[in-house]
């Protein structure tokens, strides 16, 4: 196992442990995102488009655009554009709320549900390939540490 310092060919040690941990987190996230993007591209999706479809399938009913945006894994400034592209591909439909015409609901199509069904197994395989070397206790600890690391960020939402 190589350290981040070796991986980055950094001559001097990191200035402080927080810096090393944060750079480790960013490096790991980047490597994971590359692999997930490659998988979703095989199915004609971006990770953000997949995330929207996953949210809609999980909810089981249409959701307002702002509700979808609040549930995204990554902050997305152009969610309307993402939904436009999903609609053009026949993966979602929009419906205006009858009680409040300003609210637009997004519905997942059967075609999208079928597409997600095709993605499910390769995605689970990828989860196992990327983190299967960690035992359940280590995975739990990792999740807890990441949640703790996010705590100061929850009170201060990210701006795009």
Regions of interest found by a model, annotated:
Residues 1-43:
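N-terminal leader segment of winged-helix/HTH proteins
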